[in-house]
Amino acid sequence: MDNYFIMNKIENFRINYNLGALRRKNLSPSPINQFKLWFNELSPEYDFNAMVLSTYSKLDGVQNRVVLLKDIKRDGFVFYTNYNSLKSRQIESNNNVSICFFWPDRQRQVRVNGKAYKISNQASIKYFKKRPRKS
């Protein structure tokens, strides 16, 4: 299939999302608990913990990248990054961030807006010690 065909047909491509509507009465009063319920339904066969993290800085504007969720706490979501990375510097200058999970097999996305904070230095060191050196 060549690119010409794909680009001329892309406007007609549509998946019917029919798994059902989201009803407030069926949701947990706690957004974190609801997220955990949905998260536990997922299959670990793909990067089910992948999320798009969006940051902003005056210099770079909005930047999006995929990071991996590593923990869910009572007060938020945990991911790790190098403190010298662009995303870390952007969060340092403006900690208003957005994350988005997309789970196509569940026909669901979860969007979260909030403030990012550094976890303890001890927790960060513990995590990075478990990782392969060049990862």
List each model region and its residues:
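Binding-site signature for planar aromatic cofactors or substrates
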Residues: 2-135
